[in-house]
Structures are given as C-alpha cells and as structure tokens.
From Swiss-Prot:
Substrate binds at residues 77, 151, 172-173. NCBIfam families: MTA_SAH-Nsdase (TIGR01704), PRK05584.1 (NF004079). Keywords: Amino-acid biosynthesis, Hydrolase, Methionine biosynthesis. It is an enzyme of class 3 (hydrolase). GO terms for biological process: L-methionine salvage from methylthioadenosine; L-methionine salvage from S-adenosylmethionine; nucleoside catabolic process. This is 5'-methylthioadenosine/S-adenosylhomocysteine nucleosidase. It comes from Staphylococcus carnosus (strain TM300). Catalyzes the irreversible cleavage of the glycosidic bond in both 5'-methylthioadenosine (MTA) and S-adenosylhomocysteine (SAH/AdoHcy) to adenine and the corresponding thioribose, 5'-methylthioribose and S-ribosylhomocysteine, respectively. Also cleaves 5'-deoxyadenosine, a toxic by-product of radical S-adenosylmethionine (SAM) enzymes, into 5-deoxyribose and adenine. It holds the Pfam family PNP_UDP_1. Its EC number is 3.2.2.9. Pathway: Amino-acid biosynthesis; L-methionine biosynthesis via salvage pathway; S-methyl-5-thio-alpha-D-ribose 1-phosphate from S-methyl-5'-thioadenosine (hydrolase route): step 1/2. Coiled coil: none annotated.
Length: 228
C-alpha cells in the first residue's frame, strides 16, 4: 500500500478523482481516502496545514494503514533562483527553518536528539527524478525547509536563505512528515511544485498558481505509482 499526503484540498483533488473503490475514513478530524489508482492500493491523506497537523496525520496513516512508502505532494515557495512557478522540487532531505536549540549545542533547524535533516529514500528520489525527466518538467533536487509560517515577505525569505543557504524551497509540512517517517522507519519522498517565489507577492501568486502547482505535483505521483 502506498500512502500519499497533501495538506490542502486543492493539492489532493486530482489524485482523489483518480481513486476507484473509494472509501472515505475520518479519524481525529483527518480525512483518509482509501482505494486504488491504476490497480495500486493507496491511502490519500488530507493532513491539514502546518507541522502538528502533518505529524498527527502521518502517524495516523502509518499506524492505521501500514503503508510501504509515503509520498508527500503539494506546493512550495521557491527559495533558489533556479526555480520558477510550476517547477518541481524533489527533496533529498528536509529540515526545519524555525527550530533553534543552538543554545544547547545543536545545529540550527535540528530538534534535540534528532538528525540535523531527514533524508528521503534514495530509490524514491531516483524514481521521481526519472518521472520528472520523462515528463519534461523543470525539476531540481535538494533541501526543502519547513516552518509554521507562510513566507510572504522578502525579509523572511532572506533570513531563511542566510540560515540555510542550500535550501531550495520552503513550505509548512514536509519536515514534520519526514521526521515522523524517520521515527517509524517508513521510506518517504517529498515532491513539491512551486506555487510562489516566497516574496512580497507570494500570497497573490499562491492563490493564482496553486492549481497549476497541484497539477504538476499530482502528475509526478500518478507516474510514480505505476512503478511502485
């Protein structure tokens, strides 16, 4: 079984419409859509926005349905200038941009007694990269950073880039999903399409391009499912 997680209705709608033998299950205010996509058994999860929602949803997904792997799909704000709206980021690893326990000797972004970053599964990264190339999308591999703030100001963006110069994109759930998968030893990957440039116009461009980003990220998931 393949677990798929998206934070917003807009980010999972295309995938939900592809599910056959659909069964809707609600646990602790989290919606799960169980069924099949192209004969592959899936559970599509509407996590809600933010790190706590993402961690709760991922934990429920793992404990209730025991997925073999987890795919996180959705949108993100670009931090790297090589990414434009509609482009795709495949996570090699994920960390928090708003965690700071440096006073106790930890790295910025590191939760105490946890890794500095959470590495995506190598095989899933290779598969996602292959799909992006086959679909002739502009895709990049790299670090994605997460925090409980929508990055809609240039000053916020610059602070994150100063602290995490290798970060390619920013959003609000991926690292919580990654940490939960790490703790439960479930392979994962994060694929996000760019909906905005994490700048002063981010809120407007997000609203305008979330549909395009959802389409791109959903296409990657659908193609990956054919090989899982």
């Amino acid at each position: 079984m393949i677990g798929i997680i998206g934070a917003m209705e807009e980010e999972i709608l295309i995938l939900k419409e592809k599910i056959t033998d659909l069964e809707e299950i609600s646990i602790a205010h989290v919606k799960f859509y169980k069924g099949y996509i192209d004969n592959q058994e899936v559970v599509l999860t509407l996590s809600g926005i933010g790190k706590v929602n993402a961690a709760i949803s991922t934990t429920l997904l793992i404990n209730t349905f025991s997925p073999d792997v987890i795919l996180n799909t959705g949108s993100a704000g670009a931090l790297d200038h090589s990414l434009n709206i509609g482009d795709v980021l495949i996570s090699t690893e994920a960390t928090y941009h708003d965690a700071d326990a440096t006073a106790f000797g930890y790295e910025l972004g590191q939760i105490p007694n946890m890794p500095i970053a959470y590495a995506a599964d190598d095989d899933l990264v290779t598969l996602a990269q292959s799909v992006v190339e086959q679909q002739e999308m502009n895709g990049k591999l790299g670090l994605i950073v997460s925090g409980d703030s929508f990055i809609g100001e240039v000053s916020q963006r610059e602070t994150i880039k100063t602290n995490f110069p290798d970060a390619m994109a920013v959003e609000m759930e991926a690292t919580a999903i990654a940490q939960t998968c790490y703790q439960f030893k479930v392979p994962f990957i994060i694929t996000r399409a760019v909906s905005d440039l994490a700048n002063g116009e981010a809120n407007m461009t997000f609203d305008e391009f979330i549909g395009e980003a959802a389409k791109s990220s959903s296409e990657i998931v659908l193609e990956m499912l054919k090989s899982l």
